[in-house]
Structure formats: structure tokens, C-alpha cells
Curated annotation (Swiss-Prot):
(6S)-5-formyl-5,6,7,8-tetrahydrofolate binds at R22, E85, R124, K458. The gene is mnmE. Homodimer. Heterotetramer of two MnmE and two MnmG subunits. This is tRNA modification GTPase MnmE. Belongs to the TRAFAC class TrmE-Era-EngA-EngB-Septin-like GTPase superfamily. TrmE GTPase family. Gene3D superfamilies: P-loop containing nucleotide triphosphate hydrolases, Probable tRNA modification gtpase trme, domain 1, tRNA modification GTPase MnmE domain 2. It comes from Shouchella clausii (strain KSM-K16). InterPro entries: G_TrmE, GTP-bd, GTP-bd_TrmE_N, GTPase_MnmE, MnmE_dom2, MnmE_helical, P-loop_NTPase, Small_GTP-bd.
């Protein structure tokens, strides 16, 4: 497949020590040579080496920029094409000057994600690995990064490949039995199909069982902080964020809108939503905030319900317990540095199986216990382990669910008098759906949409 040579800035725009302009394609080295003047031509430079020199302007014969240029020859590169990376001084002017010079010599400005797209089209990575690159870039915690890294390395791809191979062998045996009954091949009976598909189904279900945790690591937990006004919701948010994000006062109704912030709680990314205190109010601005709080409650994955240790439980408190029934909740009894008036026995009764944590955010007490409770609620205290194959991508989850349904159909049919060649339809469809995860037989529009999510230069 012949492609033109592309170029883009690969480092973040802004002031910095170094900026990188990356080229990829058959003419990458030749274009570099049109600009670069050093001790030797780039064409004569061995692969995977760096050379020092200057980028020159043909017209004025003056230097455009001082640079270190890396030459990497196909196929041992990110895209499996020749790659040249020009390392120049950081800064908007210098990096853009180099990019414009490269484009003037014949390179085309790359589209978002086009370098990774070429890695996919040239067979260096499959589609699930490419999606792992996006997750790696967007990781908000070390745990999320480790999971994404395993996907980039191909751990999910290998699992999918193993399942597809087992299905392919089953399909092949069925077809041999039908088309060449005289051959001495294994007879693929309905009973044997049942056994093989049961194994495949168990593997698919095992992958889907990781989806909830995987989604949490990829997208973060939408976490609503709720409670009556002035119980310490904003102080809780500030304790987890470690900065004064919300206004903390003794005046009820201070938080009149929802505030959002991402925080890392023991490897679990939380998208914290500090809601306005839920109460009846005549203040029109505060009332809008209260309505948004109720909406945030409906959309949350985790609820942090804050109570005041220094006050008796109110009807509003009990109504909040009723509102979050059936959801994942951590109950926080705050202000334990003050004289206690709350009925802790009643609190535990209302909390049921949900954890109850006593805190004083003013004195920084109980924060560690709170973080431990959140981590245990979703990861039983930890997510690290030898097997970090988590399914987190919505596209993968959807395809696995479809594959699961067809595997179940094949198993159900194998227990009836349905002919083997009809059972094969569901077996084949299971194989096809798993293939779509790694990029087999996917539409070009899907590929274009996926890579458009990348930043320029990746």
C-alpha cells in the first residue's frame, strides 16, 4: 500500500525545552535531507541514530533552526514506514516554523491519529491495540495506564485470537464433515459443538466480567457528593482534591451549582461532582443548583452521602438514604471533632451493607479510611495483579455481548434436533464478531471515526 508522506507536531503546543516534528512515509528521509545540513546526509545515516545539524532556508541560505534529527527506517518503526523526527527548540514559533518548512518540501499535514492509523493499516498493531493507545494517552491513574499498556502490548488481542482459532477449527470441522464426508476427519456432532462452544462462552463471560472495573479505570467513576447544606460536602471535595476548589463557609447554600474535578483515589479515578445541598429553597439560583444535584444523583456510579456528626438525623437525611437505595454508596459522618448528637446506630441501620466512615475534614481525620472504603467498594481493595486484561472499551463490550448471545444460541441449538450446518451459522457469527474487536472486516467509516479521536502527531 503506497501512501504519501505525512508530518505533524508530536509534542504539546506551548513553551518547552524541546519540540518534535514527526514525518512518516517513503519520502520522509528525502524531505529531511532537503532541509537538513549536518556532518552527513540523512540518507547516509544508519537507522535509529540521531544526528546534529541545522535546518536551512534555500533562498537565504540561513539557518531556520538548530536541530537533532532522528532517522528510523522501515519496517522497525511505529508506522512500519520510514520515520524522521526533528527535535528542535520548544516554543510555538520555532516548532511551527519547522513544520511549515517540512510541508513546503512536500510533506502533507497529518490528520489526527494518522500515524497510529498507518501502524494499523500496515499491520503493526490491530484495532484493539490502537484503541489501547488512546486509553494510554488519556489515562488518569497508574492503574488505568497499566491496563491500557497491556492492551497496547496485545494481551486482549491474544485472548481474542485464541478464541477465534478455537471457533475456526470448529467451523472447519463442520464444513469438512458436510462437504467431504468420506474424509477421515473428526465428526463434529452437536454434542461436541456444545462442549467447544461452552468453553468459548465461559471465556467471553470472563472478559465481560471485567467490564465494570475496566470502564471505571477508563472513564472514571461519576461520583456525586450529596447531603444537606453545610455538612461538609465541599470540605470533602477539597480534601480529596488537595486544593480549595469549592467555597467552604458556614452559610447554608454556598455551593449553588455543581462543581466537577477528577481525583485519583488509590488508583481509582473519580470524577467528583460536588452538588448543591439538596433542600427546599426560595432562592431561584440555589433552586437550579438543587435540581442539577438531583440529576447528578441519577447519573452517578458512586454516591458519597455526607452527614453531620454534630446534628441529629433529620427527615432530609433519611430521605437521602431512601433516594440512594440500591446504589453504591459510602456514608460519611463528618465533623467528629465536634460534640456528637447523631444516632450512629440508626445511621448504620439506614446504610445497610454500605460502608460508614467517620471523618473530620477540618482536622484531616478519616480521609485514609474513606479512600480505602471507595477502593474496596469497586476493586475489593486492589486491581493490580498478573492478569491486567480488562475490557473497558464500549465497542468491545458491545461486540462481546453480541458474540455471547450467538454462542448461547449455538449451545441451545446443540441441545435440540437442529442440524449441525444450521448451528454453524451462530458459531460463524461468534467468530466474526470477535474479529471485529481486533479490526477484521470492519467498515472504513468506523476506522476513520476511531482514529479521529487521537491528537495530531500520534
Amino acid at each position: 500500500m503506497e501512501m504519501d508522506t505525512i508530518a505533524a507536531i508530536s509534542t504539546a503546543l506551548g513553551e518547552g525545552a524541546i519540540g518534535i516534528v514527526r514525518l512518516s512515509g517513503d519520502q520522509a528521509i528525502a524531505i529531511g535531507d532537503k532541509l537538513f545540513k549536518g556532518t552527513k546526509r540523512l540518507e547516509d545515516t544508519p537507522s535509529h541514530t540521531i544526528v546534529y545539524g541545522h535546518l536551512m532556508d534555500d533562498a537565504s541560505e540561513e539557518a531556520i533552526e538548530e536541530a537533532m534529527v532522528t532517522v528510523m527506517r522501515a519496517p522497525r518503526t511505529y508506522t512500519r514506514e520510514d520515520i524522521v523526527e526533528i527535535n528542535c527548540h520548544g516554543g510555538l514559533v520555532s516548532v511551527n516554523r519547522v513544520l511549515q518548512a517540512v510541508l513546503a518540501k512536500g510533506a502533507r499535514l497529518a490528520e489526527p491519529g494518522e500515524f497510529t492509523k498507518r501502524a494499523f493499516l500496515n499491520g503493526r498493531i490491530d484495532l484493539s491495540q490502537a484503541e489501547g493507545v488512546i486509553d494510554l494517552i488519556r489515562s488518569k491513574t497508574d492503574r488505568a495506564m497499566n491496563v491500557a499498556l497491556r492492551q497496547v502490548e496485545g494481551r486482549l488481542s491474544k485472548k481474542i485470537g485464541k478464541l477465534r482459532q478455537a471457533l475456526l477449527e470448529t467451523i472447519a470441522s463442520i464444513e469438512v464433515n458436510i462437504d467431504y464426508p468420506e474424509y477421515d476427519a473428526e465428526t463434529m456432532t452437536a454434542k461436541l459443538i456444545n462442549e467447544k462452544m461452552t468453553i468459548v462462552l465461559a471465556e467471553i463471560e470472563a472478559l465481560l466480567a471485567t467490564a465494570k472495573q475496566g470502564k471505571v479505570l477508563r472513564e472514571g467513576l461519576a461520583t456525586a457528593i450529596i447531603g444537606r447544606p453545610n455538612v461538609g460536602k465541599s470540605s470533602l471535595m477539597n480534601s480529596l482534591v488537595h486544593e480549595a476548589k469549592a467555597i467552604v463557609t458556614d452559610i447554608p447554600g454556598t455551593t449553588r451549582d455543581t462543581l466537577e474535578e477528577y481525583v485519583n483515589v488509590r488508583g481509582v479515578p473519580l470524577r467528583l461532582i460536588d452538588t448543591a445541598g439538596i433542600r427546599e429553597t426560595e432562592d431561584i439560583v440555589e433552586r437550579i443548583g438543587v435540581e442539577r444535584s438531583r440529576q447528578a444523583l441519577k447519573e452517578a456510579d458512586l454516591i458519597l452521602l455526607v452527614l453531620n456528626y454534630a446534628e441529629k438525623l433529620s427527615k432530609e437525611d433519611e430521605a437521602l438514604f431512601e433516594a440512594v437505595k440500591g446504589l453504591d454508596v459510602v456514608v460519611i459522618v463528618n465533623k467528629i471533632d465536634q460534640t456528637g448528637r447523631i444516632d450512629m446506630e440508626r445511621v448504620r441501620q439506614l446504610a445497610g451493607e454500605n460502608p460508614v466512615v467517620a471523618t473530620s475534614f477540618l482536622q484531616e481525620e478519616g480521609v485514609d479510611q474513606l479512600e480505602e472504603a471507595i477502593s474496596r467498594l469497586f476493586f475489593a481493595g486492589g486491581v493490580e495483579g498478573a492478569d491486567l486484561t480488562y475490557v473497558s472499551n464500549a465497542r468491545h463490550i458491545g461486540l462481546l455481548n453480541q458474540a455471547k448471545a450467538h454462542a448461547e444460541e449455538a449451545i441451545a441449538a446443540s441441545l435440540t434436533d437442529v442440524p449441525v450446518d444450521l448451528i454453524q451459522i451462530d458459531v460463524t457469527r461468534t467468530w466474526e464478531l470477535l474479529g471485529e474487536i481486533i479490526g477484521e472486516d470492519v467498515q472504513d467509516s468506523l476506522i476513520d471515526q476511531l482514529f479521529s479521536q487521537f491528537c495530531l502527531g500520534k
